[in-house]
């Protein structure tokens, strides 16, 4: 045989081997198991650490399921997958046609949140399914150190999505910390000792469960205008929480579709609390130049001054003066500023020429304070009007907008969010959404989003000490949360007997713009609190859970760029001495605490080694604030 013929046959052989190998990898994927007669495939986190996702296909009716395991125990029991469109039922009758796996590594810098520099490492598996009629469904599964997520990918021509079959079945001996769903996401969290005993009804996609395999926070990520927001639906005495779309309305699909990530943040309580998985799954920033995006504390005037302040230039200048004295970078003007003088909720048709806002912005800028302003979202629904409002505000020098009362997670409203975010980014305006959805990865994709409400904050009267201690493990894991702490003058606080607890919330709750809701007079009456608030940094480099029990206790430490650790704690229950471990690093630390005394706030200091436990006195339903810095002989304060 000539060398030429040998080469020809060798080429054919290599081609055939490659084809056979590809078939083996996709149609008969490695890692398949046979539990009974079902086939199952594992997806593990790099580099093989927990958790593990198991995708299974029932051969009897072809319905897919997902199981999540960690440390040899179930976190999520076998739970249904799939969805139904106008053209096909993609929740059963499926067969696997292929599978591929890749490693995803992404590095990014966050302008807000628990940490600044982030690295996301995930294993991604793509499962290709089809029905006997030929309809196709791809399932993407990602597994990371801190969780599991999946999404559906549909080709063109599949039709509108009618519903999802997605659900999460918890082990029956799990506990739940959940809040009933409402469009503004503001209802309080409640703790149930069994997942099945939670009342029937809808629950938010920020549900925390304590399972035999660890904690699991169910959420979603990468929600945009191609889909609608989802919530969980629970039937009485059931361990299953089903995914329901907004008002059960069909999802309009044009072309192909990627659904949001159905996300399970899982691990021990520390892992879940410190997780950035919801952001990690979201698309990278759409804002190339982020140099203008500057977070930081703000003096918010609504709870301090109400309607009168919103319509008074004199009052707003007073707040600007106080923010400047405290070196807080922002002051927020709430509702009323564009209304007719002396009238409420009536827009001045000549607001652009009559408004005192340009004068306030100039006044504030001269003192080093940026002004942010409130807007009702309906002013920004029409593209022409949106451009008029935002361009005018930007030309005046306004630094940000607080947009309110969307109160919907419909597909149409999610499209509006994208339009508003594109416009605010173009005009270099920071954003705070109120009456809104929750972040769901939005802050990575649109880094000008400093914070969002989606929580029953300081202005509500139905908060409890248990609610305060649940939020760090639920809502605030998802993203920045505008609780607006620091309202010492409010008589309706659940921690009204604990000014130290109120102070601690300013650190315990992360928000890119930490809107401080107190009056200048209330801060002046509490010099220990005022001095602490003056030290708050613009952003956090790192976050660590020191101790906690969802709904009962939470103590978090957040590191500033200068190496100091700010610590906030809140507790539900009787007065006691809290044992707080210092997970701050080796060496000796000077810890300054602010606690409640019989005559007001008390400031104390102690020196402790990293890893040691300090004792902090806490009043009933109270808390504390602290500041820790490296100790050296002669150092007596952590203040700069």
Regions found by a protein language model. Give the residues of each.
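Beta-strand-rich binding/interaction modules
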Residues: 69, 575-599
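Catalytic cores of secreted or luminal carbohydrate-active enzymes
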Residues: 500, 504-546
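Secretory targeting and sorting signals
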Residues: 1-33
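Carbohydrate-binding surface patches
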Residues: 549-586, 624-627
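C-terminal beta-strand-rich structural cap/linker in extracellular carbohydrate-active enzymes
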Residues: 606-640
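An acidic-aromatic substrate-binding cleft motif
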Residues: 254-330
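N-terminal accessory beta-strand-rich subdomains and adjacent acidic, glycine-rich linkers
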Residues: 36-280, 600
């Amino acid at each position: 045989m000539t060398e030429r013929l040998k080469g020809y046959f060798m080429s054919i052989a290599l081609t055939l081997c490659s084809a056979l190998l590809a078939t083996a990898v996709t149609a008969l994927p490695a890692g398949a198991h046979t539990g009974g007669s079902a086939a199952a495939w594992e997806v593990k986190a790099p580099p093989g650490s927990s958790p593990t996702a198991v995708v299974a296909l029932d051969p009897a009716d072809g319905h897919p399921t997902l199981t999540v395991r960690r440390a040899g125990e179930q976190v999520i029991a076998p739970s249904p997958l799939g969805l139904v469109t106008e053209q096909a039922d993609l929740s059963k009758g499926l067969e696997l046609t292929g599978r591929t796996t890749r490693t995803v590594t992404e590095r990014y810098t966050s302008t807000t949140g628990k940490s600044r520099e982030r690295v996301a490492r995930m294993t991604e598996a793509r499962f290709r399914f089809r029905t006997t009629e030929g309809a196709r469904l791809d399932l993407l599964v990602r597994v990371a150190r801190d969780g599991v997520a999946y999404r559906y990918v549909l080709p063109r021509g599949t039709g509108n999505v009618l519903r999802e079959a997605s659900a999460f079945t918890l082990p029956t001996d799990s506990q739940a910390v959940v809040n009933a769903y409402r469009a503004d996401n503001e209802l309080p969290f409640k703790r149930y000792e069994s997942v099945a005993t939670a009342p029937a009804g809808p629950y938010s996609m920020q549900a925390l469960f304590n399972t035999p395999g660890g904690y699991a926070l169910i959420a979603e990520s990468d929600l945009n205008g191609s889909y609608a927001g989802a919530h969980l639906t629970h039937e009485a005495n059931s361990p299953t929480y089903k995914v329901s779309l907004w008002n059960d309305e069909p999802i309009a699909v044009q072309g192909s579709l990627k659904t949001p990530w159905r996300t399970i943040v899982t691990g021990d309580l520390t892992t879940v609390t410190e997780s950035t998985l919801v952001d990690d799954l979201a698309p990278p920033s759409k804002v190339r130049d982020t140099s203008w995006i500057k977070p930081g504390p703000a003096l918010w005037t609504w709870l301090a001054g109400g309607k009168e302040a919103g319509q008074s230039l004199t009052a707003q200048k007073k707040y600007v003066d106080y923010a400047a004295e405290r070196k807080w970078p922002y002051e927020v003007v709430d509702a009323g500023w564009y209304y007719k003088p002396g009238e409420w909720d009536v827009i001045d048709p000549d607001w652009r020429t009559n408004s005192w806002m340009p004068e306030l912005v100039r006044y504030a800028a001269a003192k080093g304070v940026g002004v942010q302003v409130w807007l009702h979202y309906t002013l920004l629904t029409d593209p022409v009007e949106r451009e008029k409002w935002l361009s005018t505000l930007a030309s005046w020098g306004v630094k940000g907008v607080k947009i309110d009362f969307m109160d919907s997670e419909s597909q149409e409203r999610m499209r509006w969010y994208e339009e508003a975010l594109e416009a605010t980014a173009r005009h270099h305006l920071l954003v705070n959404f109120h009456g809104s959805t929750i972040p769901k990865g939005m802050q990575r994709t649109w880094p000008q989003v400093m914070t969002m409400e989606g929580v029953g904050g300081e202005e509500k009267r139905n908060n409890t000490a248990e609610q305060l201690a649940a939020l760090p493990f639920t809502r605030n894991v998802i993203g920045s949360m505008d609780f607006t702490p620091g309202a010492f003058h409010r008589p309706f606080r659940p921690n009204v007997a604990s000014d130290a607890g109120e102070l601690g919330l300013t650190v315990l709750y992360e928000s890119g713009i930490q809107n401080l809701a107190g009056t200048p007079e209330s801060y002046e009456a509490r010099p220990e609190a005022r001095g602490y608030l003056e030290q708050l940094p613009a952003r956090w480099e790192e976050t660590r859970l020191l101790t906690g029990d969802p709904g009962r206790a939470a103590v978090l430490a957040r590191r500033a760029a200068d190496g100091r650790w700010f610590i906030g704690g809140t507790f539900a229950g009787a007065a006691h001495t809290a044992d707080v471990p210092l997970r701050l690093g080796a060496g000796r630390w000077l810890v300054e605490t602010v606690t409640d005394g019989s005559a007001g706030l008390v400031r104390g200091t102690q020196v402790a080694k990293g890893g040691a436990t300090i004792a902090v006195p806490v009043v009933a339903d109270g808390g504390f604030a602290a500041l820790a810095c490296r100790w050296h002989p002669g150092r007596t304060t952590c203040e700069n």
